[in-house]
Amino acid sequence: MRPKTGQVGCETPEELGPGPRQRWPLLLLGLAMVAHGLLRPMVAPQSGDPDPGASVGSSRSSLRSLWGRLLLQPSPQRADPRCWPRGFWSEPQSLCYVFGTGTKVTVLGQPKANPTVTLFPPSSEELQANKATLVCLISDFYPGAVTVAWKADGSPVKAGVETTKPSKQSNNKYAASSYLSLTPEQWKSHRSYSCQVTHEGSTVEKTVAPTECS
């Protein structure tokens, strides 16, 4: 989903800014997003509170003004960039914007990879212990963000759902898992249960039926 408005910018003292080798890729990233309509270039204010309403024109001077603003720097407190609703903090003295609404920008270091999804029904041993847990394993996806939704007979299920945070695998792709905890009666009272995984706009759904497992 495209952001309605957005900013990539940075106000930082020259001595704290990135060197020329870091500037060019980040500047080109910002200009590419502008060219593809993913980002409306905005000028970061020189002082005071962030003002998302100041737009940058197409003049040469405006493009020059973008030079020092189309930059992204990692937060010194964290290993990876983090977004907040009002922008992106790097050094204490500098405020960098990443889309006005806090949308995360991922710079891909490798090709995208769709997840492999496997859905396991409750085991017979677990059912005998008066429990029923469905396990949805999600592996080999990149970048490392997925959304998981559970359904019973096509209707959303919210209660009893626990999803882990994606973790990096040895192949630099990501894996996660999601669990749906039920009672044996709940498990047997529906025709089917589904685990729906959405990654980068594509959805993979796996379904299991209690009758197939009896």
Curated annotation (Swiss-Prot):
Tissue: Contrary to IGLL1, not expressed in pre-B-cells.
Keyword Disulfide bond: yes
Keyword Disulfide bond assigned: yes
Disulfide bonds: C136-C195
Ig-like C1-type domain sequence ranges: 115-209
One of the record's GO cellular component terms: extracellular exosome
Region (C region): 110-214
GO biological process: immunoglobulin mediated immune response
Residues that span the membrane, as ranges: none
Stretch list, region J region: 98-109
GO molecular function: antigen binding
Matches recorded under Pfam families: C1-set
PROSITE patterns: IG_LIKE, IG_MHC
Entry's localization field: Secreted
Keywords: Disulfide bond, Immunoglobulin domain, Secreted, Signal
Designated name of the protein: Immunoglobulin lambda-like polypeptide 5
Species in which this protein is naturally found: Homo sapiens (Human)
Lineage summary: Eukaryota, Metazoa, Chordata, Craniata, Vertebrata
